[in-house]
Amino acid sequence: MANIKQTIDELLTLDGAMCAAIVDTASGMTLGSGGSGLDLEIAAAGNTEVMRSKYKTMAALGLNDVIDDILITLGKQYHIIRPSKVKEGVFIYYVLDKARSNLALARRKAQDADANMKF
């Protein structure tokens, strides 16, 4: 099991990884972060709104399901938002350079990081 810092460090080992954060969904605050290329405090707050919106939409549609991850594909970056299966109310925010990363490996890395994270 890995603590938050170890989880961030592990996420950043993937080729093309730029930055990562563990975010509290209720407050939008980072519980831990690392890497560079973005202001992770602003990104955490903004992507908390993405999470809240998706949950609200799922409820309105009557979807009785869970979110594995949310992928936002930009021209030069991938942004992966993965709600934790280990700790309710927390998500992993993972940013990768699109030209240097493998999306399938990145999604798997986020899944494994979540499974091994302890609070």
Protein language model features and the residues they cover:
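Non-catalytic interaction/Regulatory regions outside core domains
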Residues: 1-119
